[in-house]
Amino acid sequence: MADKLTDDQITEYRESFRLFDKNGDGSITKKELGTMMRSIGEKPTKADLQDLMNEADLDGDGTIDFPEFLCVMAKNQGHDQAPRHTKKTMADKLTDDQITEYRESFRLFDKNGDGSITKKELRTVMFSLGKNRTKADLQDMMNEVDLDGDGTIDFPEFLYLMAKNQGHDQAPRHTKKTMVDYQLTDDQILEFREAFRVFDKNGDGYITVNELRTTMRSLGETQTKAELQDMINEADADGDGTISFSEFVCVMTGKMIDTQSKKETYRVVNQGQGQVQRHTRNDRAGGTNWERDIAVGVASNIIASPISDFMKDRFKDLFEALLS
């Protein structure tokens, strides 16, 4: 059966197979099979993939090896729809720089480092790259590549989506720069995450008007709902009524200054005195108000304007300065 394939076809299939054989054991799962076939221009449905697996997976272990895959591909030659992208596969559409950028952004939001992201994380990754998508768009993207229905996609699947959707993106509303363009260090990202968590009370990855109000009140500030909504709107690039982590970072990095230090200290304006306190992460175990310090300290560190420009160390002034 394999003699029906040309040497070039076998080479292409072998390269794709190796790419998606994650653990290098010489076999792939149904989900990996679907991703691999799309990478070489095929468009199998879930039913098609199940039929292929049933046909090739002779021992019923849920995987197929390369010889089995070659037999399936040879047998099904001439029965597939013409690939949408002619001679080039999806991966060929991306430059090395694009792949590097996508890999960095993917890694940034792969929170547990398992090589996959959820739909919610996909939304954040897309925005960090300056690509705005509706919830319906994101669901369609997930449905297309999440063949096993586990609610996650891996990096090769993500690359496929990026290649397929090139040229269909709107410019980000905030700024021409995206989150990845700022080339933040791991320490800077950690600082942003800690500050973001102060606002994101329920930990769902978004700051709502109510969560913003709660945090502001804890800092001694009271605003009307309209004022709080204005603050949300300034940062809400995709118009969903909330601030995601990437939106939060994009706003704040717009006025970022270099504040890295070997001790990873946080500058905190001492209330009513205008003096600078320094708190390291070791203070977390002490008696300091860590949440307030990290919120104000991180913001203080990344504001381009001098601290003396602020009338108070209240976070209201700080936050409004960020959004101005």
From Swiss-Prot:
Chain residues that bind Ca(2+) 5: 200, 202, 204, 206, 211
Domain EF-hand: 8-43, 44-79, 97-132, 133-168, 187-222, 223-258
CDD domains (alphabetical): EFh (cd00051)
Matching PROSITE patterns: EF_HAND_1 (PS00018), EF_HAND_2 (PS50222)
Lineage: superkingdom: Eukaryota
Keyword Calcium: yes
Protein residues bound to Ca(2+) 2: 57, 59, 61, 63, 68
GO process terms (BP): cellular response to hypoxia; response to absence of light; response to mechanical stimulus; thigmotropism
Induction summary: By auxin, rain-, wind-, and touch (thigmomorphogenesis) and during darkness conditions.
Membrane-crossing residue ranges in chain numbering: none
A GO CC annotation given for this chain: cytosol
Chain sites annotated for binding Ca(2+) 3: 110, 112, 114, 116, 121
GO molecular function term, any single one: mRNA binding
Residues that hold Ca(2+) 1 according to the record: 21, 23, 25, 27, 32
UniProt cross-references to SUPFAM superfamilies, sorted A to Z: EF-hand (SSF47473)
Residues bound to Ca(2+) 4: 146, 148, 150, 152, 157
Keyword terms: Calcium, Metal-binding, Repeat
Binding site for Ca(2+) 6: 236, 238, 240, 242, 247
PANTHER family given in the database record: CALMODULIN LIKE 3 (PTHR23048:SF0), MYOSIN LIGHT CHAIN 1, 3 (PTHR23048)
Assigned protein family: Belongs to the calmodulin family.
Free-text function comment from the UniProt entry: Potential calcium sensor that binds calcium in vitro.
Subunit structure: Interacts with PID. Binds to ABCG36.
UniProt protein name: Calmodulin-like protein 12
Originating species: Arabidopsis thaliana (Mouse-ear cress)
Gene encoding the protein: CML12
